[in-house]
Amino acid sequence: MSRAWLSLASRPCAAATYSSSPRLCRPLYYHHHHYLLTSTISKSLTTCTSTRTRGSLLTLAIETSCDDTCVAVLERLPSGAARLHFNRKVTSDHRAFGGVHPLTAVLSHTAHLAPLVQEAFRALPRESNDSNDRTLWVDGVARARPDFVSVTRGPGMSSNLATGLNTAKGMAIAWDVPLLAVNHMQAHALTPRLVSALAKTRKGAEDRRTTEGKRGDEKVIADEPSPTFPFLSLLVSGGHTMLVRSRALTDHAILADAENIAIGDMLDKCARMIVPAEMLHGGPSTTSNPTISTMYGPILEEFAFPSAVGDDNYDYGYTPPATRVDEIKPFESSHGWTLTPPLAEMGRAMAFEFSGINGQVQAILHDRNNAVPLDERRLLARETMRIVFEHLATRILFALDGTGRPAKLRPRRGGRAARGTKSEVAENKGTGQDITTTTTTTMITEIKTENEQKEAEEAREPATVDDDEAEPPIRTVVLAGGVASNRYLRHVVRSLLDARGYANVALECPPPALCTDNAAMVGWAGLEMYAAGWRSALDVVAIRKWGLDPRGKDGGILGIGGWVRG
C-alpha cells in the first residue's frame, strides 16, 4: 500500500489509499465529489509547498486546450517520486449555450490565466540558496525558479491553445529557461505514471537506489515510473475516443479510433435528452454540488445510478456478456423500445462508433413525445451507458487477444447495417416487424457461422491490426481522459477483462481530478520529454489536430516541427 496526498474540490489535503492489486482500477477512497464541475478556482491533488530537493526537476505547467484554464507546479525528485506543489483550474461558464462556446472560453482564459500563474508563483518551493541564479523573489520570499515551462500545444481549440502557449513563451524568455510544448493526448496517456510518482512515500523514495548522470547542470532521473511500456491506453473524452498501444514515450500506435463523434460528446448529448430538465439545468446535481456545468456526462451517470454516489462498493448488478454473440444482442426493454450495439455488423473491426446509439436514444424519446417516466429514463440511461462501455471494452479485448481486424471493413455476407437511426428503431408499418431486431438476428446468425469457420477466416484476413514483429505482452490497460472518471465504465471494463481470461491484466485509472483536463498531467509529460532530451523552439504555434501515432500522416508526436534536442 502507498499513500498519495490529494486535495479535491476546495478542501484541505485528504489521503487517498491505493491498492497494488491489479484487479482494482480506482482509489479505494476518494472524496465524494467525483468530478470538478465548477466555474470557480478549484484545488486538486496538491501537496504543501516545501524547500526544493537538490537535483530535482521543477516545471510550471499550463493547459488551455478547451474550456479549463489550468496551472500547476510539479517537481520530480532524483528518486523518481513527484511533488505537486500547485494544481488549480478555472472552468468557463457555458450554461447559456449548452456546450463549449469558443469565444467564451478564450475570454475566460484571458481573464483567469494570469491570476492563476501569479498564485502558482507563490506556491513554488523555497530555494535554499537565495544567492544563485535559480532564485525567484516572490513577495520577498526566495522561490526556486522552474527549470523549464510546460504547456499544451495541441490538439485542441487553436485560439484557446494560443493563449496558454504565448503566456508560457513569455515566462520561458523572462526566466531564460527552455519551453516544452507537449501533446495533450500524450499527457493523458502518461497520467498513470504521474499518479505512481505522486504515490511514492518519502521513505520509499529515499531508500530507492537511483542512477544519476549529468546533462548540463541538471541530473538525469533514471527511475522508471509505473506502468512501464508497453501498455494499452483507452483515451476517452469529449473530443477523442481512441485505443492506443503505448510502446514508448513518443510511440503510441492507434489501434482503434472514433469514426464520428467522441464518446464524451455522445454522453453529453444523451444526457441532455434523457435527464429531466430540472435535474440538468435548474438545480444542484445529485452530488449536492451547488454548481452547474455543461459537462452533462457525469450528470447522466449520477442520474442512472443515484445510490452509487459516494459508495465505492456499489453493486451495479452487471453481468458481462460471455461471448461475442451476447455482446451484439440488442437490448429489448419491456417498454417497447430497443437499443442495438454499435458496429454489430462489422465483426471485430477495430473502430468506435457512437452517433448511431445517439440517434436511437433520440428516436425513442421522440416517438414518445418525450413523455417518459423517471424510472424508464433511468433504465434508458443505464442501458445506453452499458452498451457503449461494452463497445469500448470489446475493442480492448480484440487488441489483447489479437483478433481485431482493420477498421475499414465492409459488412460481411450481406446484412444491412443497423446504424440506430429512427427508421431502424421504428416499426415497419406495413408488416409490424421491428427492423432493428430482424437485422440484428440476421447478424447474430452470421457471426455464429463465422465462428464455425474461424480458421478459414483467419487464413484469408490478418488476425491483428498491427503487422509489427511480436511484441512484449500487455500487462496493463490504462483508462484516461475525462470520461475515464466514470466509475460505471471502470466497472464494466474490469468485469469484462475478468470474465474473458484477463484477470491478471492491471487496469490503471487515475483519480477523477486527474482524468479531466489539468495542468499536472501536462507538467508530467513535460518532465518526461525534458528528461529524454527534448525541448521546444520558441517559434512553435498551436496545433488544432496533432496525432500520437508515428505511423500516422503527421508523423505523430515528433513528426511536427519545433522540436530541438537539449
Descriptions of predicted regions:
Residues S246-T319, F354-R368:
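Glycine-rich phosphate-binding loop plus the immediately following alpha-helix
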Residues E302-D434, I444-V477, N486-D498, L558, ...:
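A contiguous, well-structured pocket-lining segment that forms one wall/lid of small-molecule binding clefts
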Residues H188-T191, P510-G552:
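Glycine-rich phosphate-binding/hydrolytic loop that grips phosphoryl groups
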Residues A181-V182, R475-V477, V493-V522, S536-V540:
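Conserved phosphate-binding/catalytic loops in two-lobed NTP-binding clefts
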Residues D68-E75, L190, S233-L235, T241-R245:
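Short beta-strand scaffold segments in enzyme catalytic cores
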Residues G55-R145, V151-P155:
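N-terminal beta-alpha supersecondary unit
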Residues M1-S56:
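N-terminal mitochondrial targeting presequence
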